[in-house]
Amino acid sequence: MSTTIAVLTGAGISTSAGIPDFRGPDGVWTKHPDQMNVYDLDLFMNDKKQREYSWRWQKESPVWKAQPGVAHKALARLEQAGMLNLLATQNFDALHEKAGNSEDVIVNLHGTIGSSHCMKCGQAYRTADIMAKLDQEPDPHCHKPMPYQGNMPCNGIIKTDVVYFGQALPEGAMEKSMRLASQADQFWVIGSTLEVYPAASLVPVAAQAGVPITIMNMGSTQYDSLATRLIHEPIEEALPKLVDKTIAGQK
């Protein structure tokens, strides 16, 4: 029976794909703390100018042109080898999906930028369609006809499915991640500072279940003492080697 590995990824796995991290030494929020307001739910819902700024900022994000790097592709190989039971990610860039990982293992803890919803009626939208009309409608609102209002448009605020500060994680995301992390034979943390909760709590959950933990991150984390293996090397170099070695060990 093959080894099962649960993985948590953070922004560090995507920096080599051209997406800057948020909390590292050169992170967006480290250098520009005011940019955290882009993802503040209360401001977004109550301040028209903030909504417009948030939409413009997200439209200009490098996420849209980014392609998966060798580290993302390594995790796709791990799944193809039948060894990956969980890929929980704090990233909303969808690069794991682009690399070939399946919805069966991916849990987008912090949502995804590719889809959007009306905060009033729940109508779903493709974010790319909204972005294409942003010059004409800088503060996107829902146009779904409401039968009980004489087919007048809903006019609710539209927001991307990225989880904002003050917003709950997708339903069941943490429960599934905690269960699979505690059932795995190994738990790997890849490119996360482990500063954001509840995602960071997966480490002590796995540790309490007796699961060996690998933390691969350029900087130290608060949970390094729980790790059985620490790797402070560039992820795009270290992760493919670790995956290849792990797969080879099963043959």
Model-derived features: where do they sit?
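Conserved catalytic core of sirtuin-type NAD+-dependent deacylases
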Residues: 1-251
